[in-house]
Amino acid sequence: MAMPLCSLTSYNPITTTLRGHHFLTINAYVKTQCIPCFFIKLHTRSSGSKQRIIDLRSGSSNIVACVGEGATSLSSHSDIMKTAKREEIPPGVWKDDISDSIMSSHKPEADEKRVEILIAEIKSMFRGMGDGETTPSAYDTAWVAKIPALDGSDHPHFPQTLQWILQNQLQDGSWGEGTYFSTYDRLLATLACIITLTVWRTGQTQVRQGIEFFRKHAGTMEDEADNHQPIGFEFVFPAMINEAKSLCLDLPYDTPFIKQIIEKREAKLKMIPTDTLYTVPTTFLYYLEGLQEIIDCQKIIKLQSKDGSFLSSPASTAAVFMCTGNTKCLEFLNFVLIKFGNHVPCQYPLDLFERLWAVDIVERLGIDRHFKKEIKDALDYVYSHWDERGIRWARENPVAYIDVMATGIRILRLHRYNVSSDILKTFRDENGEFYRFPGQSERGVTDMLNLNRCSHVAFPGETVMEEAKLCTERYLWNALENVNPLDKWGLKENIRGEVEYALKYPWLRRLPRLETRNYIEHYGANDVWLGKMMHMMPYINDRKYLELAKLDFNNVQSIHQKELRELRRWWKSSGFAELNFLPDRVAEIFFSIASSMFEPELATCRAVYTKSTLCTVILDGFYDVHGSAEDIMLFNEAVKRWDHSLLDRMAEHIKTCFLALYNVVNEIAEEGRKRQGHDVLPYIRNLWEIQLESFTKEAEWSRAEHVPSFHEYIEAAAISSALPTLVLIGVIFTGEVLTDHILSQIDYRSKFAYLMSLTGRLANDTKTYQVERGQGEVASAIQCYMKENPELSEEEALEYIYRLMENALADFKCEFLNTKDVPEYCRRLVFDNARSMQLIYMEGDGFKLSHETEIKQHVKKILFEPVA
């Protein structure tokens, strides 16, 4: 019978068989007077137990009882079988002179002053965030300008707005957003302005030019995509056409499109549920100026926002004020004009929207480390306005918008704020489909893309997030079938590229520098937002962000190139390159750490991680393929002694492996002593002994052609994956003094580290088991599971392993989001190790076969190719 998934994703302290009769148990938690320890018990079935405690702080290594003499020998096969298992080494990807060729002419020091200026300017933007910066709306300004003077005189109450209209007509005779031409936007704004000028009997020249523009372009509206229609266009445009008729303006009223939109409005007006129109805030509040003949203005006042507006819309608020004289409406309009002077935007405030999007931009562009305080201040502000209804685009806004809600949930969760996803249920219909606003049936590419991103930070059991993931994936794949996928609330030049990237590389396959490089290529500094009118938001779309991101990326890449050149020199001097165990994969392995732990101050962490990984890969090949049983026993003994006393008994390839490991570990330990303030050599040696014992066990399985139980294999994989070893060495160099509490959350005692190892091993197995089986490897997750479930086909077993991995990844993600009191770099090292494995084994063995997978292109983009 197939094992239930839940039985393997639950966490237990790790117990695995190592070196024949010995068992390794990693205790779930050990505390000895708050001194950080790495606590390991070695048991035998015969003569009691032995116990070794490695104290990271003191560096002492106390053997409570000796490990025992004479480990059981490994089963030996013939040298012929050993040779048969050796795989043909894939070709190297990078040329021998790569060290010189990768060194770009980029000089980071030349950019330092400009970088400092940009950082200061962006910090100033964050500090200056109030209720939101946005561009003028000619349409809304025209509505405000229509308000007559309160003293009854024949003048506008806000004469400055009328002057703005007279002074801001575009050269073609239209009004509207000048940076992007949309027929809908221009005609709606132009119609509003010529009506207002006609009402006040001024600007005859501007009116004539506006009418000429309108007549010229009215017939082309039917050619523009429906997705470019402003929100509420089908209500406000026909209403204004009727007003233009009453003013005897010479417009082409018989144009087919105008007739169609009027008919469409009449049909929609009949469908409006008048019983709920005055009881529940809806998007109708956003365009009340287009519904004046059907609404009771006195009743609608009940849905007025606390700030006096109707859904933050100056036009809608102005229309209600002219109908009711409500003083709160006037207070809101005065408030907006105090901010903007002689014009108004299409909606205001936008305080929550602006802060969330600014944080999202600097994070996705990879420059967030320069703005830690600003980000925290912005998110504290956003979270202070989170309630049981979630958040809106503005603090007083009564209508929920899924784009803001989804983005808020994702960003706040990633920053450890406690927010619930239950609010997303209000956007879901009975068929499990999600829409932009509750109870409505419109949605756009950006809405669904941000909801999809949100769904990836789900906790186990959050059904609504899983439903959102499935719904958005369907929608986005369908959107890609269009030649030019269009968005409803934004005109983005690179929306297709963003969607393709998000679908191909979900969050758990996405490394920070790849995300940065991709977003630099897709960020639109000139993107236009589409609400009731087109508008731009300068604190969200600003070329300063992009300029800093490019400079920063190239500066960091230049640092990484220098590090890679030194690592390649070390690789050649170590003797590893001559062993023919592995092709030159220094760049790929360095990429796996540099694409996540990329900050300049983590240079030592990257070097240590890369060297340790190369040692691990080489030794895995030695134990697995290139070493005899006797070779392995000799090597293990040499590592235990940690001296040169056995070198004379070693073959050259064994000697090379040992000396390289010996020198690397001693070098790392010396640097670690400086960082941690005490001797860490016993700690690091102990990690390697554990690692090599796991390699020994797997070699024993292979030589005996033994397929272990699935449970035994999975438990052993927690160590044999080598990920804990690499993380626990690398974490020494993240700038933190390691306490027992920190270690307990990321070492073998933690579920976090266990799931990192498990998911990494399963990702590896699913893409390598067939090749390794052909080389004589008999133990993999797939084969072990099939042994216990012989009724299953290989495809069914593989499908089970994929499901197991997905469940484990969900738990792992939860651990990452919930891990408390662990420094950011430590958490990231664990989390991004797991993500790196998911990416590298996405198509195949991305380390060994990088020349055949996309990994080569990723390496080039992150390490070799600067952004232009």
Swiss-Prot record:
Binds 3 Mg(2+) ions per subunit. Keywords: Lyase, Magnesium, Metal-binding, Plant defense. Its cofactor is Mg(2+). Its EC number is 4.2.3.147. The keyword Oxidoreductase does not apply. It comes from the Eukaryota. Transmembrane segments: none annotated. It catalyses: (+)-copalyl diphosphate = (-)-pimara-8(14),15-diene + diphosphate. Signal peptide: none annotated. Mg(2+) 1 binds at D620, D624. Pathway: Terpene metabolism; oleoresin biosynthesis. One of its GO terms (biological process) is diterpenoid biosynthetic process. Mg(2+) 2 binds at D620, D624. Mg(2+) 3 binds at N764, T768, E772. One of its GO terms (molecular function) is magnesium ion binding. The Asp-Asp-Xaa-Xaa-Asp/Glu (DDXXD/E) motif important for the catalytic activity in the class I active site is degenetated, but the Mg(2+) binding sites are conserved. PANTHER family: (E,E)-GERANYLLINALOOL SYNTHASE, ENT-COPALYL DIPHOSPHATE SYNTHASE, CHLOROPLASTIC. Involved in defensive oleoresin formation in conifers in response to insect attack or other injury. Involved in diterpene (C20) olefins biosynthesis. Monofunctional enzyme lacking the DXDD motif in the class II active site relevant for the cyclization of geranylgeranyl diphosphate (GGPP). Requires (+)-copalyl diphosphate ((+)-CPP) as substrate, but no activity with GGPP or ent-CPP. Pimaradiene is the major products of the enzyme. Belongs to the terpene synthase family. Tpsd subfamily. This is Monofunctional pimaradiene synthase. The lineage of its organism: Eukaryota, Viridiplantae, Streptophyta, Embryophyta, Tracheophyta. The gene is TPS-mPim1.
